[in-house]
């Protein structure tokens, strides 16, 4: 207490209150992490029967943000097929297929694999499949390439009919998922702590939305990461909370773990500046962050796409909003209802572990292919 006696009454009171606040924050965070770790330890890992298949997997060749998806799919395939070979779009895919004679050539994303190459691979007798992981944003391109594959898997529910109209007969909805080697509950330093966190690029739809909530967010401990946020009209209000940079998946997970609330706001499928979707295919399905936020054990507040109830229970495993006003209202509510917030986050984590890993998705893909052989 010697230090406290040297302070004036106001300083002493501030120091005591600060210590209490820090203790409360640390205790609260530790309790949440402990409960999350119990959920993870009690989860029964998904195990799928290995398929008697030889597979040649062609990565996206796109770098971030697609390379982590490549890695997660490959790791899941390693557990579930008899033989796996991996190549990039820069490799001679026709030559490799001729040499290896895989039963399946699985192309991820496929922007750098020409239709001529796909046709040549098919002529060699291998079954071809593509998993489009960023539909409907590249529909102007994918509508021309999909017909050349034997099987088409898409992350976007609305694209099933879209590809069928292009002449594809075997089209399946296959959502993305979480890589549990990256996104999971973990202890992080206090520098990662926040009341509210948002990670994502400043597409114009997001810019307009954040302009409306910026005055409110400026009063909170907020962290925002991503490209182009200087476009905000309200940038001056939030500049000290914004880092205009792309975060690695590992860093993203740390900020999710340190946040009380993580906002998810989907990009618009109609943004002509960035999209190649001139036919204006709707976006009904949830983005990868939906799974990653829940997989981190964080509390998610998301705008609700039509397919969300098929993946998570709104109000049970995460929370939703439909306007800027409702988002502010729910941020306030859940910041002041910690137990309810943490309960939803835990249930979201449980659901993710049970249903939404890349092991689950690859098992579905392989089951479709084996059943139709």
Model-derived features with residue positions:
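Membrane-proximal basic amphipathic "stem/tether" segments
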Residues: 1-49
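Extended catalytic core of nucleotide-activated donor transferases of GT-like folds
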Residues: 36-169, 180-184
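Catalytic binding pocket for nucleotide-activated donors in carbohydrate/polymer assembly enzymes
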Residues: 49-61, 68-88, 253, 257-373
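Active-site regions of enzymes building and remodeling cell-envelope glycoconjugates
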Residues: 83, 149-150, 168-172, 234-247, ...
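Acidic, amphipathic alpha-helical patches
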Residues: 93, 117, 142, 249-252, ...
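Carbohydrate-associated surface elements
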Residues: 177
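Conserved catalytic-core segment of nucleotide-activated headgroup transferases in glycan assembly
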Residues: 188-261, 267, 271-274
């Amino acid at each position: 207490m010697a230090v406290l006696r040297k302070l004036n009454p106001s300083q002493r009171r501030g120091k005591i209150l600060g210590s209490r606040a820090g203790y409360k924050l640390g205790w609260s965070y530790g309790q949440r992490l402990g409960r999350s770790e119990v959920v993870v330890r009690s989860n029964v890992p998904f195990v799928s029967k290995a398929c008697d298949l030889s597979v040649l997997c062609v990565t996206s060749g796109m770098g971030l943000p697609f390379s982590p998806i490549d890695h997660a799919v490959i790791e899941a395939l390693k557990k579930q097929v008899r033989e796996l070979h991996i190549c990039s779009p820069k490799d001679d895919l026709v030559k490799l297929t001729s040499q290896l004679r895989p039963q399946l050539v699985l192309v991820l994303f496929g922007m750098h694999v020409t239709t001529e190459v796909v046709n040549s691979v098919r002529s060699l007798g291998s079954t071809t499949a593509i998993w489009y992981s960023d539909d409907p944003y590249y529909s102007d391109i994918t509508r021309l390439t999909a017909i050349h594959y034997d099987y088409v898997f898409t992350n976007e529910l609305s694209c099933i009919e879209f590809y069928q109209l292009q002449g594809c007969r075997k089209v399946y909805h296959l959502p993305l998922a979480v890589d549990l080697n990256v996104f999971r509950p973990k202890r992080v330093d206090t520098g990662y702590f926040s009341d509210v966190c948002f990670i994502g690029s400043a597409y114009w739809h997001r810019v307009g939305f954040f302009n409306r909530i910026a005055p409110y967010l400026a009063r909170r401990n907020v962290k925002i990461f991503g490209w182009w946020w200087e476009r905000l009209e309200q940038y001056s209000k939030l500049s000290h909370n914004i880092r205009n940079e792309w975060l690695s998946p590992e860093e993203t997970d740390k900020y999710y773990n340190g946040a009380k609330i993580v906002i998810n706001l989907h990009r618009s499928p109609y943004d002509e500046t960035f999209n190649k979707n001139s036919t204006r295919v709707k976006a009904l399905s949830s983005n990868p962050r939906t799974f990653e936020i829940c997989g981190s054990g964080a509390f998610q507040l998301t705008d609700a796409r039509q397919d969300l109830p098929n993946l998570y229970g709104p109000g049970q495993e995460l929370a939703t909003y439909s306007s800027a006003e409702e988002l502010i209202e729910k941020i306030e509510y859940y910041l002041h209802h910690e137990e309810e917030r943490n309960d939803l986050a835990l249930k979201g984590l449980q659901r993710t572990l049970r249903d939404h890993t890349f092991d689950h998705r690859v098992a579905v893909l392989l089951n479709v292919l084996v059943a139709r052989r």
